Amino acid sequence: MRLKNISLSGFKSFVDPTKIAFPSEMSGVVGPNGCGKSNIIDAVRWVMGEISAKNLRGESMADIIFNGSSSRAPSARASVELLFDNDDGRIGGEYSSYSEISVKRTVDIDGKSTYYLNNSECRRKDITDIFLGTGLGPRSYAVIEQEMATKLISSKPEELRAYIEEVAGISVYKERRKETESRIKRTKENLNRVSDLQDEIDRQLLKLSLIHISEPTRR
């Protein structure tokens, strides 16, 4: 699996629709300071589900939308789409048979985000789920920032373990276990409520039966 291209529009400095192709397994983006290289990395993280504006070097999510300049009007929305080559079937589940998988996210000026998988609207969770264990995600080890080495050195043990588990592909199983445990907990809570209702019904039935027995006695 590899990234084939990125399509951006209205995202930070990419005001016009822009398509950046990655024709091989190794590509480089070079240019002077301020030309938008970091914005490309921000775009990848954002479309993969990043929800913290601070991690995208902004104050609010609306900051990722092109804010206008002396010669250009502000954009009303931002859009980023990633196209992945999935010939190796690395992305499994219902998408394993797709040779290409597109992931898209848009945001309006009011901050409302919409996600898409292969042009079908989906939830943020759907995107994070299919990429679990692949090394891709809003804060995965696949996206290495300049400060990453410092962060790793100063990471708490549980934070460092999370990186190692993602690299080893364990995170997908931990997430599934967490979801299963959550479903089991909800099921137990529902069973307890059913048991309480059953007890209440039994009490009411007993009360009604006693009333029924006492009626002939009164007569």
Show the residue positions of the predicted features.
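Short "domain-exit" segments at the C-terminal end of structured domains
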Residues: 215-219
